[in-house]
UniProtKB/Swiss-Prot annotation:
L-serine binds at residues 226-228, 280, 379. One of its GO terms (cellular component) is cytoplasm. The keyword ATP-binding applies. It is an enzyme of class 6 (ligase). NCBIfam families: serS. It holds the Pfam family Seryl_tRNA_N. It catalyses: tRNA(Ser) + L-serine + ATP = L-seryl-tRNA(Ser) + AMP + diphosphate + H(+); tRNA(Sec) + L-serine + ATP = L-seryl-tRNA(Sec) + AMP + diphosphate + H(+). This is Serine--tRNA ligase. Keywords: Aminoacyl-tRNA synthetase, ATP-binding, Cytoplasm, Ligase, Nucleotide-binding, Protein biosynthesis. HAMAP family: Ser_tRNA_synth_type1.
């Protein structure tokens, strides 16, 4: 939710942002018009309440013979106040509804859609194989790491089991991420995976992509697609202390996505699935600190990717590919040899005050006045990483070398095919 004062003062900036996102700039003018109507409705209601108060004093001072006529006038005024307050409530709800439709203001992201990102950096060189590399599923099955057939039997398409060393590899990766997060000052959390509608809406996930979210109608609850949602809701309607710097959490949770718009895409293996595990970083900070915190989250992701030894690139995501809450987003994408392309492993987003305003998460400034906090998020490890780890570290004999940083968790240097 964007600041109405910012909208009034900078309507062209918000219109340009809408165009950059590929969204309707007319929504800006619709909201400005609704905001003006709301302000007029407030003024009318305030004036009538003031008149009603003055009229009440007049009745109290009136003589007995004048009071009946004045009481009749008071009843008429009371009806007008009630009508004006109803009009004010309607006008305020209209503004709120339009505010909830308007995406965050893009800050520095390139224009365009999904394919218009800008590559900021390449790290590591894609490996040249002197044998025909296997894809992650073939490797996962031959090494006894992934069981898609039984996952499908038990739960349907896009479900799987991680078995044996596959389970240990993921647990090791996520544990390493948790260790790195706590060493960097993040408080680890295992948050709920079911949240109320107001929390899901507060994070900006109930817009155009709400079909991606699992909804439990009987309980009126949503399954999270990222622990960002529960971590953002943690301080809803609170004033938090940011005097000693940003408040930082890292959530370890299972995540659930319907993949409603992905029919036929990535149907093989665990690249695009309905359930996966993830360690997600989440930061609350003062708005002026958000850009620096965004850079730090990206550095955390780079450090973790270096530990798992995969070549990757960093992209500046285009405005048309941003989620509603993000003002800017950087993705890291790892090289997947059998696909001959880079695939997303992490995202880190600067959501400025968009989520904080929706969830009413505030801090006190140097004058003690409550202000809206900024929020940021970033992936530190997730199930999908196994794809890049397996494919980039495979050997001609079908084995996979375990990245050195993960060996203490897996208990092996090399994963051998199951005989």
């Amino acid at each position: 939710m964007i600041d109405l004062k910012f909208l009034r003062d900078n309507p062209d900036v918000v219109r340009t942002s809408q165009i950059t996102r590929g969204e309707d700039p007319a929504l800006v003018d619709e909201l400005l018009s609704a905001d003006e109507a709301r302000r007029q409705a407030i003024q009318v209601a305030d004036e009538l309440r003031s008149e009603q108060k003055a009229f009440g004093k007049k009745i109290g001072q009136a003589s007995p013979e004048d009071r009946p006529a004045l009481l009749e006038g008071s009843n008429e005024l009371k009806a007008k106040v009630k009508e004006a307050e109803a009009a004010q409530e309607t006008a305020e709800q209209r503004v709120h509804d339009l505010q909830m439709k308007l995406s965050n203001v893009v800050e520095g992201a390139p224009a365009g859609g999904e394919d218009d990102f800008v590559v900021l950096e390449h790290v590591g060189e894609p490996r040249t194989f002197d044998f025909e590399p296997k894809d992650h599923l073939e490797l996962g099955e031959s090494l006894g790491l992934i069981d898609m057939k039984r996952g499908t039997k038990v739960s349907g398409a896009r479900f799987y089991y991680l078995t044996g060393d596959g389970a240990m590899l993921q647990l090791g990766m996520l544990t390493l991420a948790a260790q790195k997060a706590t060493a960097a000052g993040f408080t680890m959390m295992i948050p709920p995976v079911l949240v109320r509608p107001e929390i899901m809406a507060g994070t900006g996930f109930l817009g155009d992509h709400s079909e991606e979210i699992y909804y439990l109608e009987r309980d009126d609850m949503y399954l999270v697609g990222t622990s960002e949602v529960a971590l953002a809701g943690y301080h809803k309607d609170e004033i938090i202390d940011l005097n000693n710097g940003p408040v930082k959490y890292a959530g370890w949770s299972s995540c659930f996505r319907r993949e409603a718009g992905s029919y036929g895409k990535d149907t093989r293996g665990i690249l695009r699935v309905h359930q996966f595990d993830k360690v997600e970083m989440f930061v609350y900070c003062k708005p002026e600190e958000a850009e620096e915190q965004h850079r730090r989250l990206l550095e955390m992701e780079k450090d973790m990717l270096a530990a798992v030894e995969v070549p990757y690139r960093i992209i500046d995501v285009a405005g048309g590919d941003l989620g509603a809450s993000a003002a800017r987003k950087f993705d890291t994408e790892a090289w997947v040899p059998t696909q001959g392309t880079y695939r997303e492993l992490t995202s880190t987003s600067n959501c400025t005050t968009f989520q904080g305003r929706r969830l009413q998460t505030r801090y006190r400034d140097e004058n003690g006045k409550p202000q809206i906090a900024a929020t940021l998020n970033g992936t530190l490890a997730t199930t999908r990483w196994l794809v890049a780890i397996l494919e980039n570290n495979q050997q001609a004999d079908g084995s996979v070398i375990v990245p050195e940083a993960l060996r203490p968790f897996v208990g092996k240097d090399v994963l051998e095919p199951v005989k």
